[in-house]
């Protein structure tokens, strides 16, 4: 890895940042992180306004950035430094002018945030750099010394695209926010459609990539979807209408069809939303309403994910551009399994453009595979979820396995989504699906009922838990009643969706198999907890919704405090797990975050109070502190607020608030709906495996690294710190230095780096 001196005897290293191509929510978070991380590391950031057009124009379009220039932009959509198409940059003369203007400012390092077109143009510019310098020296536009000082152009690309169409990265900046817009719209359309028993055709973006239509179809519970990677077969009109009719017969009151703006049939002929509506009317005589979502998908406030992940990418981009792994290769920093990953820029661009060629060649399986494993899995899941039971390949029989679903522990948004997915996917396997009302107490009271395909209609959109959930862990005295209920209802397996108390309940129950043999059945634990404190799961169902709820509340707290000089101390849930606190701190722009994991001392609080006062003396108007609800037995929210108030001496006031149960409420986020669906699909696969092998084992599953892992419950304490009720391994703690770097201005210093993984292949 080449080591670059951040400062020279005369001036600091200068880093340019620009946004190019279509705007995407989260670009501002990335720009903010680049600017502030560069300053924290002693480099000088420059904003190149309006993308490459600003570089071609030069002068005032290349602006030196200060810490305050990046203030107040984290929660804004679009890009505050602008983006524009630049035909001039496509020509050599335009790139030549851009090179001159960058050299005039002393910039030879660029963080470029854009799509594949912007990034490929950037790579062409990089390969020409030496030629531009030579010609500029010959023209007398720059000196030989300037050319020698900037012999090489360093490039790091960040992918900004709401379509999520870059091969090699799980997510692109803006995709999660766009999915939020679409799913919100589907939820709202579904309610009016159900009222009138109507059919809606919803057109979403995704000219060449089916991520948005496919994921919104799964998360929104759509009946039919058209994606570029899986073009419609001949006779699609009749198949679609049959699917919708059978769905209505099975209990649906509304029909939702999702179509990508780039959808085609297998001959490459475009299929528009109007084509679909016309085909529906020809075969049913009924009108289908058309809603084209358009640019609402691109605008508005970024989601929590697009804030914290874009901040992470911006931080890592500065780290990479100052110490490039290979200075001769332009790289993209993408995301794989929530880890920053280094990807060769041009190879990623070629692979991305190659998907279009695969579609044209009719190799649709390869086109889907290029989108990643999660995409191909979700294609199959969507087919199963949307297929009415009368069209299912495995209708339930008298000898069908009876699988019961139970919720336990604290409420987590997405529990209903998990139950819906379990019922419909289980029925597709030919099983009889049962619901247990009222958690373990309900099972003991024999509150067990069969759940049919239409019983769970609409559950995907709802917060709460239709089956109910309770926190108490059953005692040994209740085991007999639980065992009798399992036997009486002929339950062959249990799907337990819940939090840590659910895990502990299963652990304790299965330790008594000799005395209570009824518990000797396959049991799969599915993680659902806003605390994100469960073993063997990097993210639990409900965590993303809680994070978005918290960030929404913190945004409003900041607005309320902005009218006067104020410090606000906000308390978040999580018990002794600081995930919500740290991630909401990064996503909301908090200055301080206090976590149970860090054992804050009184001396540190005293130092923080002095620094807080100094910032207000320097002109600050707002200061946000986030604290975990169990950060410390003594140094809690009220204590911190009192200390900061005592230090203020009237310079500013201090308010505190516990965000409370709003973090548990509301409809589950798109991510939580998709996570719940994927985990349930994997859980049913585990049950299928146990049934076929004659095994009866209690296990817990979760997304870890690049796969959903299955682990035995009897080894659970290998992963779990029971004293603090959280996992030993908490991946998100590696992000702690980022909050420090981008939230509080200080003297340039060494920053603890984040780990940047190297992509070994494009299979992810």
Residue ranges of each PLM-predicted region?
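C-terminal non-catalytic interaction/assembly regions of soluble proteins
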Residues: 272-397, 641-764
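Short, ordered loop/turn segments at secondary-structure junctions
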Residues: 20-23, 48-54, 85-86, 115-118, ...
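Accessory alpha-helical/coil subdomains and C-terminal extensions
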Residues: 45, 112-114, 120-154, 172-290, ...
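N-terminal phosphate-binding or glycine-rich loops at protein starts, especially the Walker A/P-loop
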Residues: 2-59, 397-444
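Short glycine/serine/threonine-rich phosphate/pyrophosphate-binding segments
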Residues: 24-34, 55-56, 91-96, 116-124, ...
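Glycine-rich oxoanion-binding loops at beta->alpha junctions
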Residues: 2-8, 56-110, 119, 145, ...
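Short glycine-rich or small-residue beta-strand-to-loop segments that form or flank ligand, phosphate
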Residues: 14-22, 79-84, 108-114, 157, ...
């Amino acid at each position: 890895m080449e080591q670059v001196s951040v400062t020279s005897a005369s001036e600091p290293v200068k880093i340019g940042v620009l946004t190019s191509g279509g705007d995407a929510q989260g670009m501002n978070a990335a720009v903010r992180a680049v600017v502030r991380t560069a300053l924290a590391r002693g480099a000088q950031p420059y904003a190149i306004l309006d993308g490459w057009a600003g570089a071609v124009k030069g002068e005032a379009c290349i602006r030196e950035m200060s810490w305050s220039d990046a203030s107040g932009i984290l929660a804004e959509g679009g890009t505050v430094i602008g983006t524009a198409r630049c035909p001039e940059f496509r020509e050599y003369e335009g790139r030549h002018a851009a090179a001159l203007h960058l050299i005039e400012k002393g910039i030879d390092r660029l963080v470029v945030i854009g799509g594949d077109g912007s990034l490929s143009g950037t790579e062409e510019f990089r390969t020409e750099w030496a030629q531009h310098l030579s010609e500029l020296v010959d023209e007398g536009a720059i000196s030989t010394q300037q050319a020698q000082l900037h012999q090489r152009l360093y490039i790091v690309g960040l992918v900004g695209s709401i379509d999520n169409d870059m091969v090699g990265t799980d997510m692109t900046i803006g995709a999660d926010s766009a999915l939020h817009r679409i799913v919100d719209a589907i939820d709202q359309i579904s309610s009016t459609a159900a009222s009138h028993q109507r059919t809606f055709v919803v057109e979403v973006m995704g000219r060449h990539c089916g991520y948005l239509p496919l994921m919104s179809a799964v998360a929104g519970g759509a009946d039919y979807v058209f994606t570029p990677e899986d073009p419609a077969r001949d006779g699609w009109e009749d198949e679609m209408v049959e699917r919708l009719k059978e769905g209505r017969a099975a209990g649906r009151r509304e029909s939702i069809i999702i179509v990508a703006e780039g959808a085609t049939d297998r001959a490459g002929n475009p299929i528009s939303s109007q084509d679909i509506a016309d085909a529906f009317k020809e075969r049913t005589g009924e009108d289908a309403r058309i809603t084209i979502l358009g640019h609402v998908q691109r605008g508005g406030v970024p989601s929590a994910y697009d804030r914290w992940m874009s901040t992470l990418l911006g931080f890592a981009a500065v780290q990479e551009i100052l110490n490039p792994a290979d200075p001769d290769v332009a790289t993209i920093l993408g995301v794989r399994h929530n880890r920053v990953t280094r990807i060769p820029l041009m190879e990623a661009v070629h692979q991305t453009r190659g998907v279009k060629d695969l579609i044209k060649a009719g190799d649709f399986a390869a086109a889907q595979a290029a989108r990643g494993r999660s995409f191909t899995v979700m294609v199959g899941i969507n087919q199963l979820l949307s297929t009415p039971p009368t069209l299912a390949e495995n209708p339930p029989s008298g000898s069908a396995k009876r699988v019961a679903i139970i919720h336990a522990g604290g409420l987590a948004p997405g529990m209903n989504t998990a139950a819906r997915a379990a019922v419909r996917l289980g029925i597709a396997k030919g099983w009889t699906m049962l619901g247990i009302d009222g958690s373990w107490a309900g099972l003991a009271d024999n509150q067990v009922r069969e759940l049919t395909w239409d019983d769970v209609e609409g559950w995907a959109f709802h917060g709460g838990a239709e089956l109910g959930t309770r926190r108490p862990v059953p005692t040994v005295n209740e085991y007999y009643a639980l065992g009798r209920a399992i036997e009486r209802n002929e339950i062959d397996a249990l799907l337990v969706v819940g939090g840590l108390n659910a895990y502990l309940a299963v652990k304790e129950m299965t330790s008594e198999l000799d005395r209570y043999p009824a518990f000797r059945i396959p049991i799969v634990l599915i993680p659902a907890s806003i605390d994100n404190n469960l073993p063997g799961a990097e993210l639990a169902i409900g965590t993303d919704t809680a994070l978005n709820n918290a960030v929404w509340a913190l945004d409003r707290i900041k607005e309320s405090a902005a009218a006067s000089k104020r410090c606000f101390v906000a308390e978040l849930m999580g018990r002794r797990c600081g995930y919500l606190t740290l991630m909401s701190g990064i996503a909301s722009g908090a200055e301080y975050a206090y976590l149970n994991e860090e054992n804050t001392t009184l001396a540190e609080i005293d130092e923080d109070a002095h620094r807080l006062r100094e910032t207000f003396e320097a002109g600050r108007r707002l200061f946000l502190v986030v604290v975990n609800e169990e950060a410390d037995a003594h140094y809690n929210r009220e204590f911190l607020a009192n200390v900061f108030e005592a230090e203020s001496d009237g310079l500013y006031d201090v308010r505190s608030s516990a965000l409370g149960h709003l973090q548990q409420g509301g409809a589950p986020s798109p991510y939580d709906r998709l996570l719940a669906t994927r985990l349930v699909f994997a859980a049913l696969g585990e049950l299928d495996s146990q049934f076929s092998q004659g095994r009866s084992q209690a296990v817990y599953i979760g997304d870890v690294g690049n796969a959903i892992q299955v682990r035995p419950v009897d080894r659970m304490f290998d992963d779990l710190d029971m004293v603090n009720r959280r996992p030993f391994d908490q991946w998100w703690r590696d992000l702690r230095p980022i909050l420090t770097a981008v939230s509080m201005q200080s003297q340039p210093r060494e920053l603890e780096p984040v780990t940047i993984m190297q992509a070994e292949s494009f299979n992810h």
